[in-house]
Every structure is written in structure tokens, then in C-alpha cells.
């Protein structure tokens, strides 16, 4: 018997082919094009130029610490670019981070020894650090050799020459004119000229230069501090306080605007306000013996003698506060402000009848700073008060 052959199932074969074709498409084409939900989505990398633009905008707004962070991000994106280290160091000088500025300027020089501005900013940063004026002079000369027509470098040289003493003043005068002639549209050339005029007691002209610098960038606290100091010398106290207050608003972490406001209020006899700002300055930088000394003086002016003794003791002898802050004392040298801490301390001791130590302070003042009239008067007052105390005990 012959079997009948079954016809092929064309529909089933077609369906199977379609299934196989779909499976191939799904595995080989569709799936590879889809994002893996278990793999992090890649983040677009920012260019160093975008960080630089951000940093420049922040600097123009006076936001120095955020500007510093933006420049650091630019360096992380392009660590071989020496100009980024220079830009960072420049902002760090304005922010008072002198050691960090020195480090970054040196990093720039390592990357490019012929970067003139790197040598200039290095000199500028060194100039603010005690005992480094000779290094600053060497660095600024190298900067001038590499680029003798750079206005910023000439401006930095003005500041270094001022710190070099009287012999550098005439050269500083010439340099300030060169800097302004090369570029009158940057802050540093006007700032350098203002510092020179201040150093030569031309305070009204110095004020004009600070104001010119502020016109270029109205958001740098340092400029308002300089402006206020010159107003204070001229006894224009309301303008001085206004300038210091603006500096404080721009950089509230800086204790010096508070310090200068404190001293300005003291100069016009408003001792309660002077004490308030002296306390704020110490809160900003509790390990600074100068700020402790000023606070002690203001306590004394307000007749808080025990508190004055405590704070002036920290300024003179150093020590550790109740909060665990370590302070290094200031030795008595020929400086009117340091002498003020010592004779005010002696007076507070005398007024609380602690004459054993008070008389030692008076003798120290008479020996160490004989030409300081205020210190000598203070020593005489200490002796007088202690003599009266002794008579009262008889």
C-alpha cells in the first residue's frame, strides 16, 4: 500500500523563519543599541576653558574662594597648563593665601620656566611673607627680564620696592608710572600706585587711586581696606567705617575689617562699639595674638579689667584658651601697637592691685622702648597707680 506524502506546512515554516529573523534582530541589533540600566550614564566632561570662564566671573564678583575652587577644577582638567596655576595663585594672593599662592606659582614655573607672569606672581606672594623680601626681589627681576613690558609685573615690583625700605621709594615711583602707562585698566596698577602714595603720606591721592581700582572691580575687599585706612589717617572716620564695612561684607571671614572698625570707633571714643567689633575679629581668627591684644585694649577702655588682663595675657605670653586654641605670644619690640598691649596690660594689672607683675611690665617698657612716648607715659602711670595702692594699704 502506498502512503500519501504529506504536504509541507508552508505557513509554519514561514512563521518559524519570521521568529528566527526577529530573534536575530532583537539580539544583534536592537539590544546593543539600548543603554544598560546597570552601567552608570557617562557624564559629559567640562573643558578647562569653562572652569576658567566661571572663575573669572566669580573673581569679578569678589567671590574669591569659589573662584579658587573653579581654577582648581580647571587645573584638574588640564594639569599641564602653567597659565592656570598662575591665575589661581593671583586670586590666592587677593584672598590672603600667600603660602598657597607661592606653591602654585612655583608649580607654574616647573611647567614653564619662561612664564614671566609666574615669576611675577611668585614675587608678589613672597612679598607678603615675613623674611622673604630678598626672594621676592630675585623673582621679580627674573620676571622683568623675561617680559619687561608687562604691566602686572611692574605693579608687583612697586609693592616689593616699597617693602624694601626707603632706598626703593624713588624706583617705586618710576615703576608705578610705568605700570599705569602700560595698562591703566587693571586693578593692580592702580592698587600699586595707591600703596606708593600711601607710603609717601600722599593720602588724598592714594584714596583717588583706590577709587580708580574700585571702579575697575568694585568687589575686592582688599581695595576697601586700603581705602578705609587712608580715610582713617585723614580722620574722615565715617568714610573709613563705610569702607571697612564694605570690605567686611565682601569677605566676612577676614578679621581685619572688624579690627580696623574696632580701632576707628575707639579713635572717636565709641568704646562699646569698638569692643563689639574686637570680639568679632577674635571669633574670625581666635589664634591671632594681635587680635587678642586689640580685644584686651578694648576691654580696658570699657573698664573690664579682668577680661583685659586675660586677653592681653594671651597676646603677650601666649597660651591655650578654654576652647583649646593655642596662641603664640608677641615679644616686646619697638612697635607702637605691641607696646600698647604691654602698657595696657600693666595698667590693668595695676588697677586690680597686681603690682608685682605690673611693675615688672613698667620696667620692661622703660628698658625696651625708651623712645615710645605713650609707652613711657603708660609705665609712669603703672608706677603711680601702684604707689597709690601701696599708700592705701598703710
Question: PLM features: residue spans?
Answer:
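Helix-start (N-cap) detector for alpha-helical repeat units in TPR-like alpha-solenoids
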Residues: 48, 82-83, 116-120, 151-152, ...
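Structural marker of alpha-solenoid helical repeat scaffolds
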Residues: 77, 111, 146, 182, ...
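Structural signature of tandem alpha-helical TPR/SEL1-like repeats
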Residues: 62-69, 95-107, 128-142, 164-178, ...
Amino acid at each position: 500500500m502506498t502512503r500519501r506524502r504529506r504536504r509541507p506546512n508552508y505557513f509554519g515554516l514561514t512563521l518559524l523563519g519570521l521568529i528566527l529573523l526577529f530573534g536575530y534582530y532583537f539580539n544583534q541589533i536592537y539590544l546593543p543599541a539600548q543603554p544598560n540600566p546597570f552601567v552608570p550614564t557617562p557624564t559629559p566632561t567640562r573643558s578647562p576653558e569653562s572652569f576658567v570662564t566661571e572663575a573669572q566671573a566669580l573673581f569679578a564678583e569678589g567671590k574669591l574662594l569659589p573662584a579658587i575652587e573653579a581654577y582648581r577644577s580647571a587645573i584638574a582638567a588640564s594639569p599641564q597648563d602653567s597659565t592656570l596655576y598662575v591665575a589661581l595663585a593671583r586670586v590666592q594672593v587677593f584672598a590672603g593665601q600667600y603660602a598657597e599662592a607661592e606653591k602654585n606659582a612655583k608649580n607654574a614655573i616647573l611647567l614653564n620656566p619662561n612664564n614671566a607672569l609666574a615669576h611675577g606672581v611668585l614675587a608678589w606672594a613672597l612679598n607678603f611673607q615675613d623674611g622673604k623680601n630678598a626672594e621676592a626681589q630675585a623673582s621679580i627681576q627674573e620676571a622683568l627680564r623675561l617680559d619687561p613690558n608687562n604691566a602686572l609685573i611692574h605693579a608687583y615690583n612697586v609693592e616689593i620696592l616699597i617693602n624694601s625700605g626707603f632706598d626703593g621709594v624713588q624706583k617705586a615711583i618710576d615703576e608705578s608710572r610705568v605700570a599705569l602707562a602700560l595698562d591703566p585698566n587693571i586693578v593692580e596698577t592702580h592698587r600699586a600706585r595707591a600703596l606708593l602714595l600711601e607710603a609717601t603720606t600722599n593720602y588724598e591721592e592714594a584714596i583717588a587711586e583706590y577709587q580708580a581700582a574700585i571702579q575697575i572691580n568694585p568687589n575686592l575687599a582688599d581695595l576697601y581696606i586700603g581705602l578705609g585706612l587712608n580715610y582713617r589717617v585723614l580722620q574722615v572716620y565715617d568714610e573709613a567705617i563705610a569702607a571697612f564695612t564694605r570690605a567686611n561684607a565682601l569677605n566676612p571671614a577676614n578679621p581685619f575689617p572688624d579690627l580696623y572698625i574696632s580701632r576707628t570707633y575707639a579713635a572717636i571714643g565709641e568704646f562699646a562699639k569698638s569692643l563689639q567689633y574686637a570680639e568679632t575679629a577674635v571669633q574670625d581668627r581666635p589664634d591671632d595674638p594681635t587680635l587678642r591684644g586689640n580685644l584686651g585694649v578694648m576691654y580696658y577702655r570699657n573698664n573690664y579689667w579682668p577680661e583685659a588682663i586675660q586677653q592681653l595675657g594671651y597676646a603677650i605670653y601666649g597660651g591655650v584658651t578654654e576652647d583649646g586654641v593655642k596662641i603664640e605670644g608677641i615679644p616686646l619690640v619697638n612697635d607702637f601697637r605691641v607696646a600698647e598691649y604691654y602698657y595696657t596690660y600693666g595698667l590693668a594689672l595695676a588697677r586690680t592691685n597686681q603690682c608685682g607683675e605690673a611693675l615688672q611690665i613698667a620696667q620692661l617698657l622703660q628698658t625696651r622702648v625708651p623712645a615710645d612716648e605713650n609707652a613711657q607715659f603708660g609705665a609712669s602711670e603703672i608706677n603711680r597707680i601702684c604707689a597709690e595702692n601701696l599708700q592705701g594699704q598703710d
